[in-house]
Amino acid sequence: MLKCKVISDQPYSEMEGVLGKENISRDPAVCDSYAWQPAINLATEPWIPRPAAVALPQTTEEVQQLVKICNKHKIKYKAHSTGWACWGGPGEEGVVQIDLRRMNRIIEINEKDMYALVEPYVCCSQLQAEAMKHGLNCHIIGAGPNTSQLASVTSAWGYGWTGIYTGFGGRNPLGIEWVLPDGELLNIGTPGSGAGWFCGDGPGPSLRGIMRGWGGATGGLGVFTKCAVKLYPFPNVPKTLPFKGVLSDLVPEFKLPKTHKFYYIFSPSYEAFTNIAYAIGDSEIGYIHCKGSVGALFGLLAPRAMRILLDTPGLRNIIKSFQYMTLFAIAGQSDREFEYQEKVIKKIVEENDSIMIDNSYLPTHEAQWWGLYRSVYPAMAFRPGGAFITSMGSSEMYECCVKQAKIGEKIKQKYIDNGTFIDDMADCTWGGIYEGTSNWGHLEEIAMFDRRVPQTEKTRIEYLYATTHATVRDALGFGLSSLENQMYKWMGPLMGNYHLWMSKIKQAFDPNGSSDYSHYIPPYDELVKSMNDYVLPVNADVLDDVEDYKD
């Protein structure tokens, strides 16, 4: 276990006065329970740094007071909601963990204006369950239904299965209540004018770009305590969906309306796969569009069987032939709309020499349908080895995304061959097009590994840098691997010096550096001092032995 700094008596006493004795602790056993999360850790340690204390506020006013106490005593703090991955935890020693689990209310569901007002600890599955009672649905990012709805739209990034209909995570916040890094309160959009929560912009220039940009500040720029999020029509779905079991053992006790179906589409090439995506977007149809990964499918549902199948050359080749797979779903408002959309997708598939399987004829239809809409399957990426990382994933026109998938597959194969990653035939690319007609989206290259094999730590990091080198060399855009620790020092000068603007925002909003910025960016003065010392850990020659890289 890492050594830990414990908060001193005076600030602890002041925080205790705000929260009460039962809602703050510096007991090492309690603090240890917040350090368990190794996923996407900045270091290669199995634990993240243990917090100096854990505080559990219940109101915005209590959050403000905690933040002001931290500023007064020059203590850093980090807020988390549901705590998926290490972004919500401290990135260094001596940080107070603000655990927002007591702020867990769905305050309002506005059926007419189609939005919900939530606090930080409301997870996506909770909001979806309540929204469905009103014939509505929410966007759930690929990380799964366990994630915080507020955190995913204010502080991180993400796309979910329904992104063609419900958009990208960062496009879903409306009015926001924001405790700034110094403890002052700022309401963004209409709540700032006392006009409700239906809009996140104005009057005047919007602050949403400063608040989150593309990737969010991951807790490095204060604390978000309330947020209105968009809701979307979810036509003809029962208000409650009874079932038994969980995940792959799900046994539904309901029947879907005939206006809902999902399909497997198999194409002969990436070119046909891409053309189908563009045609779907141009036709303005669909509720789900996403690449299916046959290599990962067996790993998620049956990891032991996958090892046997992939060790059999004949079976491996058969499975590989289904690589160019699209998952597509329709949710029609009426019988006529459903019939129209199904007619269109059949024509698109035929014109691109592809085949389509109607999953409604299979006994697993309801279970798989629910797994997609609930976004439960991505969480199963932990099954084969207990951990994974992701790379590529630039949000670009879909043809560029497919190019990332091709290159990412070749790079990942090298690291499968050397034992870094679990063999999934290098086919674990996930993503789709966003927002219907836009035809932009992302495809990220997910790599699963066994954390019990520590000797792969170095090559895992090397892989992330290799994929980033590829995005630079081939002008593929700013991908998910570009968000890793200190990548802004590399990518910033290549992209309009965005890192300088971000660090100036950090310094202006957080002059004391109180909001832990380990997963964000340091203040401008600190950043400038460190820029000259930065050396890339991995050089571009890491790509030299990637087979057929330029094909």
Protein language model regions, located:
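Conserved glycine-rich FAD pyrophosphate-binding loop
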Residues: L2-K3, T44-A52, Q65-K68, H73-K76, ...
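Conserved oxyanion/phosphate-binding beta-strand-loop segments in alpha/beta enzyme cores
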Residues: E14, V18-L42
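A generic structural motif
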Residues: L231, F266-E271, A329-E337, G393-C400, ...
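Short glycine-/aliphatic-rich beta-strand segments at the starts of folded cytosolic domains
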Residues: L241-F243, E253-P268, Y324-T326, F382-A405
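C-terminal cap/substrate-recognition region of VAO/PCMH-type FAD-linked oxidoreductases
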Residues: R212, A228, K239-S248, P257-P268, ...
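Long, structured ligand/cofactor-binding scaffold of large enzymes
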Residues: P38-C138, Q149-W161
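FAD-binding subdomain of flavoenzyme oxidoreductases
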Residues: I107-I109, V118-P120, S125-P268, V546-D551
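General beta-strand structural signal in soluble alpha/beta enzymes
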Residues: I24-P28, L56, Y77-S81, I98-L100, ...
